[in-house]
């Protein structure tokens, strides 16, 4: 078994789009590790609203002020990605009890695939506990105000997606 570098944490997700909840989690994790790698997954099965490269750029823009945070897009098995960046800890956010069952199942599978890597769960600050990318996308799609949930650049990207869809109709 490989010994993983516990000083490198990997925070994987689709980040479609990155939200203030994601940013909060990374901001609180950054002081705990030498390096936090935010892995932006391609996730074609989820049918992302934003292309991978745009999600990577938006995440870099939102997290660039952290000197020890690196944002990387990936389209491989998470276990392979974690090993490729020499991660030793997987970071996952738990917003509510409803997240726990899925996250527990994923942590168990990851323990099987990459036993040298530990999963660490962090809970969001209370003001972010109800934010999810899927809710943000849906509210934005329907013309609602999501400015309190995402950075300005993400708000603009979602506005452009909505306008492009409206132009196609």
UniProtKB/Swiss-Prot annotation:
Primary localization class, coarse: cytoplasm
Pfam families associated with the record: CTP_transf_like
InterPro entries: Cyt_trans-like, PPAT, Rossmann-like_a/b/a_fold
UniProt binding sites for substrate: 14, 46, 78, 92
Signal peptide: none
EC number, as in UniProt: 2.7.7.3
GO MF annotations in UniProt: ATP binding; pantetheine-phosphate adenylyltransferase activity
Record bears the keyword Magnesium: yes
Keywords for the protein's UniProt record, in alphabetical order: ATP-binding, Coenzyme A biosynthesis, Cytoplasm, Magnesium, Nucleotide-binding, Nucleotidyltransferase, Transferase
Compartment(s) of residence: Cytoplasm
Pathway: Cofactor biosynthesis; coenzyme A biosynthesis; CoA from (R)-pantothenate: step 4/5
Domain of life the protein comes from: Bacteria
Family of this protein: Belongs to the bacterial CoaD family.
Protein name as annotated: Phosphopantetheine adenylyltransferase
Organism: Stenotrophomonas maltophilia (strain K279a)
């Amino acid at each position: 078994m490989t010994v993983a570098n516990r000083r490198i944490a990997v925070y994987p997700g689709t980040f479609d789009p990155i939200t203030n909840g994601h940013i909060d989690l990374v901001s609180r994790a950054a002081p705990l590790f030498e390096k936090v790698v935010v892995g932006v997954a391609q996730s074609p099965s989820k049918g992302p609203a934003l292309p991978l490269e745009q999600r990577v750029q938006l995440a870099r823009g939102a997290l660039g002020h952290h000197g020890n945070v690196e944002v990387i897009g990936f389209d491989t098995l998470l276990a392979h990605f974690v090993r490729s960046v020499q991660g030793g800890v997987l970071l996952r956010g738990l917003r509510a009890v409803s997240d726990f069952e899925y996250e527990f199942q994923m942590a168990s599978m990851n323990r099987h695939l990459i036993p040298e890597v530990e999963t660490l769960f962090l809970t969001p600050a209370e003001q972010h506990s109800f934010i999810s990318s899927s809710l943000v996308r849906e509210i934005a799609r329907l013309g609602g105000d999501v400015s309190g949930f995402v950075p300005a650049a993400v708000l603009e990207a979602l506005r452009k997606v909505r306008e492009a869809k409206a132009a196609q109709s």
